[in-house]
């Protein structure tokens, strides 16, 4: 049962981290290179070797998807916009014919997030490798977002530490942070509702929120319809008595 729980939980996390097509390719490779022994059991060595390959590829795929050009900018669900409290200022600028300036600012925020996301893969892999049997059971039997919540708990601090300096550097390239600070520190002198002048902190939070949003969508898919996304090996494992809790 221990080996089955390890396989199920890690594959669930892998599927949450990578796209459908990539996940199927990875799992097929595991089946081909690490076949089940007689009786349908996988050895500890098989599982360790297969998961090492799967986790490395899956985590990299996840990072690649979001760090690609327009990975954030052209995804309406996670595109980073100006803070809500700054939207009145944005409207004023657009009314004054400075819409292109605002558009460039928004683009710079998303480019910074895309740059930072390149560092996500090794952080996710470290978290998955540290997963205990208790963690695995909780994920397997948990709610729709158990894997996502596990990753949030284990990686948010590390992601923040890794992302913020990259985002800061990316924004500094276009002087975005300086302009932001100058404009909104001045604005805050007269405004009742202050605007946070820490632009890199704002973008970091939004980038991390976007990553976990994507992970949660993938987790829901595999939980609601696992048969449609796994190989024969996973169908067999999900249908086992141990996996069903009997």
Regions found by a protein language model. Name each.
Residues 26-108:
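N-terminal Sec/ER secretory leader and immediately downstream segment
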Residues 99-170:
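Mid-length scaffold segments of soluble, non-membrane domains
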Residues 66, 98, 119, 149, ...:
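Alpha-helical transmembrane segments and their juxtamembrane interface "caps"
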Residues 166-208:
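An amphipathic alpha-helical core segment
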Residues 21-24:
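Bacterial signal peptide processing site
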Residues 15-19:
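C-terminal motif of bacterial Sec signal peptides marking the signal peptidase cleavage site
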Residues 28-33, 207-246:
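A cross-kingdom marker for long, charged
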Residues 1-8:
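Bacterial N-terminal signal peptides that target proteins for export
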């Amino acid at each position: 049962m221990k080996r089955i729980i390890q396989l199920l939980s890690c594959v669930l996390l892998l599927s949450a981290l990578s796209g459908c097509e990539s996940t199927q390719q990875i799992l097929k490779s595991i089946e081909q290179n690490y076949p089940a022994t007689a009786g349908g059991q996988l050895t500890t060595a098989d599982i360790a070797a297969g998961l090492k390959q799967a986790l490395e590829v899956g985590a990299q795929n996840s990072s690649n998807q979001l760090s690609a050009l327009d990975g954030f900018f052209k995804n309406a669900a996670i595109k980073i916009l100006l803070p809500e409290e700054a939207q009145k200022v944005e409207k004023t600028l657009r009314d004054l014919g400075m819409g292109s300036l605002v558009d460039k600012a928004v683009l710079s925020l998303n480019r910074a997030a895309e740059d930072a996301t390149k560092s996500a893969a090794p952080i996710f892999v470290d978290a998955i490798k540290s997963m205990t049997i208790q963690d695995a059971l909780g994920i397997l039997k948990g709610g729709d977002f158990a894997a996502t919540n596990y990753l949030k708990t284990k990686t948010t601090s590390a992601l923040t530490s890794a992302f913020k300096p990259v985002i800061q550097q990316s924004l500094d390239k276009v002087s975005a942070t300086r302009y932001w600070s100058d404009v909104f520190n001045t604005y805050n002198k007269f405004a009742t509702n202050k605007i946070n002048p820490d632009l890199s902190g704002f973008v970091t939070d939004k980038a991390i929120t976007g990553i976990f949003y994507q992970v949660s969508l993938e987790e829901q898919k595999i939980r609601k319809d696992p048969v449609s996304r796994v190989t024969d090996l996973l169908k067999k494992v999900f249908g086992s008595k141990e996996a069903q809790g009997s």
